Design a protein with these regions (language model features):
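A short acidic/basic microdomain associated with nuclease active sites
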Residues: 1-4, 10
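Amphipathic coiled-coil/heptad-repeat helices and related helical stalk/stem segments
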Residues: 4, 44-47
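Short, mixed charged/polar active-site loops
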Residues: 4-6, 15-17, 70-74
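Extracellular structured ligand-interaction cores
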Residues: 6-8, 15, 59, 123
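Conserved catalytic cores of phosphodiester-cleaving nucleases, focusing on short active-site segments
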Residues: 9-35, 51
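A short acidic, glycine-rich active-site loop
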Residues: 33-45
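Metal-dependent nuclease catalytic regions and adjoining charged, substrate-binding loops involved
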Residues: 38-40, 50, 54-167
């Protein structure tokens, strides 16, 4: 428990917190190559930092299995790659008390080469995405398109996608 937030770690190995993850090949490579800090849409580093704070440790890591190949890796992030979890939790708790949404967590990213802009993954699963981006597409809000790989939320449509729009 950290600042009133409860979590459940997976295990400790040699006295250090270890979070066990199964990952796609793409996500597995972020752990294996040590590039998770550059793109951590699920907040894994914050999760680890929270477990470490609660346990009084600071050299934890992730034991990750590639779901496609069964390959394993152990990734121990640098301290500077982990957020100050007390500050992060306090900031989020303060933002939850606001009458209006906080600043956007993520900025839209290009979708292909024709000028369309979409929400990044970290924003796509958020239940507030429509509220945060209600002014997208010249005030019409987010436009949702169904691709074979799932839904894409466009903030700016320059070229109409050749897939079904979810209305």
């Amino acid at each position: 428990k950290v600042n009133g937030i409860v979590g459940h770690m997976d295990c400790k190995i040699n006295g250090e917190v270890v979070d066990v993850k199964s990952a796609s090949k793409f996500a597995f490579n972020k752990f294996q190559n040590g590039t998770l800090a550059a793109d951590d849409p699920f907040g894994y580093l914050g999760q680890l930092a929270g477990y470490e704070e609660a346990e009084g440790t600071d050299e934890g890591g992730f034991l990750v299995i590639n779901k496609e190949s069964g390959e394993l890796c152990m990734y121990t992030p640098d301290d500077l790659d982990k957020p100050n979890i007390n500050t992060k939790i306090n900031t989020l708790l303060d933002e939850l008390k606001l009458d209006k949404p906080p600043e956007l967590c993520y900025t839209p990213i290009p979708d292909g080469k024709k000028g369309n802009m979409k929400l990044p993954k970290g924003c796509s699963w958020c239940k507030y995405k429509h509220e945060c981006h209600k002014d997208a597409n010249d005030g019409a809000g987010l436009r949702t398109f169904k691709y074979s790989t799932g839904y894409t939320y466009l903030t700016e449509v320059v070229a109409e996608p050749k897939v079904d729009e979810v209305l």
